[in-house]
């Protein structure tokens, strides 16, 4: 089933077989998901504690209150995407960096685990942020999708994501893909620390762009 989904995405998106490919996550890479989510739950009287790189277990019912149930947090995330996807602010460094890379011949795909109810809002947000590249909506581990997309080009493929398990999935199924880890929110980035499955980690889009140029555009 997953292989079929991945093949369908690879078939849908046009990829030049001779140019490098950059596959980019959206939340916490292009968009400031965490900052917007904190505002959203704060409006409901909840607070967030940075104890682990997860939402479940870290959203409190009120200040110093008990953690919300996992299903309640899941419902909050769904409601957030349904109502606020268009309002999540972009990382202002992302669009200029991506467009500079595009002008150098890098082709770009946005691979986002966005809920189906928010796909069109995510497209709107990407366009509004001047990130006008194909969006590949996804769910679950990203290894099969990245492998399918990477198989369409002889050029180098680069993958950027904030989630360690996605890097592990890509390392397992597409080890030739160069994996860059990046998290916009500094507290989350510090909390996660070193990601063993990533080839490199960056603290901003300036560093990401340099890594990509050095890997994809130099012989």
Task: Outline where the language-model segments fall.
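Acidic, Mg2+-coordinating phosphoryl-transfer loop and its flanking beta/alpha structural elements
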Residues: 158-203
